[in-house]
UniProtKB/Swiss-Prot annotation:
A plastoquinone binds at H213, F260. Keywords: Chlorophyll, Chromophore, Electron transport, Iron, Magnesium, Membrane, Metal-binding, Oxidoreductase, Photosynthesis, Photosystem II, Thylakoid, Transmembrane, Transmembrane helix, Transport. It comes from Synechococcus sp. (strain CC9605). The keyword Mitochondrion does not apply. It is a multi-pass membrane protein. It comes from the Bacteria. PANTHER family: PHOTOSYSTEM II D2 PROTEIN, PHOTOSYSTEM II PROTEIN D1. Its EC number is 1.10.3.9. This is Photosystem II D2 protein. PSII is composed of 1 copy each of membrane proteins PsbA, PsbB, PsbC, PsbD, PsbE, PsbF, PsbH, PsbI, PsbJ, PsbK, PsbL, PsbM, PsbT, PsbX, PsbY, PsbZ, Psb30/Ycf12, peripheral proteins PsbO, CyanoQ (PsbQ), PsbU, PsbV and a large number of cofactors. It forms dimeric complexes. NCBIfam families: psbD.
Length: 351
């Protein structure tokens, strides 16, 4: 009797690599990790290096590092000089010509952090897609994370691409972001933009929904433990519900006259509201990149100019924006050598 034993199929390098990447370990790597881990490491490392050592004297005329006396709130990795335009500012490019110190002085670290940070965020979203597929769940976490990605890409990349250079993007720092917000208000009247309004409604609405949902669940927990602390009565693998949806529905029906009766609709709504807020604000930022105007109530401006007794909150805000532009531009863009004659500077209600 003859027994034929077949040869084991040869495993290619791709299969071996796939198995290694998806191996069960403390920190999952996966195919997405090939993009996420190095880019996140370089982006964070670049930011720490810039805020610790690199000055902004040559790009913004200011100090921006711990080495120069800044603290955590005032240190930043500043945007490149306006003269750099939209150059990628590669270390080996024509601007720095391989000189690392010159590259830092020109703002090369900002481009480095921005581009690697964008790819790191995309890698993190792909990581959520990959793990969701392996675990066998739906990919709504990854879809939700597209909101922060849209905001980052629109604010840090799309907006300056629509302007004259990377210089007009936000620098990577706390006070630097605040300066950028003031800039958006003064030069674009951003708070009156309907996309900003939708973004605020989405983010604050999401926070409100989160608070309401958490409080309602805590209010309607089943009394299933003898201890004062109800947290210890919960087991992650328990089959029964931990709170009463029926009681929660009756509670909110009495308060508003209407309430969610479907947990799936409720949680989808909690996903939808903040993510739509992030998406709409990102669309608005792209509009600002193209210098699109939102609401201009010209009739009120004309009447306010003609009638000293007529004033609205809109006309007051327009005057504030003029003040921001007039006083901010010379300090924010010293390389332009702006000089505004005193007679054109705004004087409050006196117009």
């Amino acid at each position: 009797m003859t027994i034929a034993v077949g040869r084991a199929p040869q495993r290619g390098w791709f299969d071996v690599l796939d198995d290694w990447l998806k191996r069960d370990r403390f920190v999952f790597v996966g195919w997405s990790g090939i993009l996420l881990l190095p880019t996140a490491y370089l982006a964070i490392g670049g930011w720490l290096t810039g805020t610790t050592f690199v000055t902004s004297w040559y790009t913004h005329g200011i100090a921006s590092s711990y080495l120069e006396g800044c603290n955590f709130l005032t240190a930043a990795v500043s945007t490149p000089a306006d003269a750099m335009g939209h150059s990628l500012l590669l270390l080996w490019g024509p601007e720095a010509q391989g000189d690392f110190v010159r590259w830092c002085q020109l703002g090369g670290l900002w481009a480095f952090v921005a581009l690697h940070g964008a790819f790191a965020l995309i890698g993190f979203m792909l990581r959520q897609f990959e793990i969701a597929r392996l675990v066998g769940i739906r990919p709504y976490n990854a879809i939700a994370f597209s909101g922060p990605i849209a905001v980052f890409v629109s604010v840090f990349l799309m907006y300056p691409l629509g302007q004259s250079s990377w210089f007009f993007a936000p620098s990577f720092g706390v006070a630097a972001i605040f300066r950028f917000l003031l800039f958006l208000q003064g030069f674009h009247n951003w708070t009156l933009n309907p996309f900003h309004m939708m973004g605020v409604a989405g983010i604050l609405g999401g926070a409100l929904l989160c608070a309401i949902h958490g409080a309602t669940v805590e209010n309607t927990l089943f009394e299933d433990g003898e201890q004062a602390n109800t947290f210890k009565a919960f087991e992650p693998t328990q089959e029964e519900e931990t709170y009463s949806m029926v009681t929660a529905n009756r509670f909110w029906s009495q308060i508003f006259g209407i309430a969610f009766s479907n947990k799936r609709w409720l949680h989808f709504f909690m996903l939808f509201v903040p993510v739509m807020g992030l998406w709409t604000s990102s669309i608005g930022i792209i509009g600002l990149a193209l210098n699109l105007r939102a609401y201009d109530f010209v009739s009120q401006e004309i009447r306010a100019a003609e009638d000293p007794e007529f004033e609205t909150f809109y006309t007051k805000n327009i005057l504030l924006n003029e003040g921001l532009r007039a006083w901010m531009a010379p300090a924010d863009q010293p390389h332009e050598n702006f000089v505004f004659p005193e007679e054109v500077l705004p004087r409050g209600n006196a117009l």
